[in-house]
């Protein structure tokens, strides 16, 4: 397994769970980088992007695993700069900052859980 990006959830904004339930999406952002957005995002520890995230890679959120089916054109740069992307679970999307994922259900979000992109 080749780990490409691994971070730990440090805070979950009040609207972040609503976005997951209603839009099947989670907005990730480095901890403290944009305090004005903290209510809408899942903040995480800083992480190093060791390899570009690509279609076919895997994402693990806690014990839930997903397959990357599409990577927006801005995702890898945004992750390098601000730890930012939008994860879309079992839904369609086409925005440049989105990672589209397929798997069972939606992840459980909690502080301390790892979010890991990897290649098998």
Would you name each region that the model predicts?
Residues 89-120:
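Helix-rich interaction surfaces within compact, conserved domain-sized segments
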Residues 64-65, 71-77:
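Short, conserved beta-turn/loop elements at beta-strand boundaries and strand-helix junctions
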Residues 52-54, 59-60, 109:
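Short, well-ordered loop/turn sites that connect or cap secondary structure elements
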Residues 1-40, 113-114:
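N-terminal disorder-to-order initiation segments that are Gly/Lys/Arg-biased
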Residues 36-48, 92-101:
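Short, structured beta-strand/loop micro-motifs enriched in basic residues and often containing a Trp
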Residues 56-58, 79-81, 93-94:
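Ubiquitin-like/PB1-type beta-grasp interaction modules and other compact soluble beta-rich domains
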């Amino acid at each position: 397994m080749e780990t490409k990006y691994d971070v730990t959830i440090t805070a979950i904004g009040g609207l972040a769970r609503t976005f997951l339930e209603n839009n099947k999406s989670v907005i990730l952002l480095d901890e403290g980088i944009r305090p004005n957005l903290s209510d809408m995002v899942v903040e995480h520890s800083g992480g190093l992007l060791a390899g570009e995230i690509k279609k076919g890679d895997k994402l693990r959120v806690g014990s839930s695993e997903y397959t990357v089916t599409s990577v927006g054109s801005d995702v890898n740069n945004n992750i390098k700069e601000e730890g930012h992307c939008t994860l879309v679970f079992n839904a369609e999307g086409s925005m440049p900052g989105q990672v589209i994922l397929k798997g069972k259900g939606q992840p459980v979000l909690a502080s301390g859980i790892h979010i890991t992109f990897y290649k098998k």
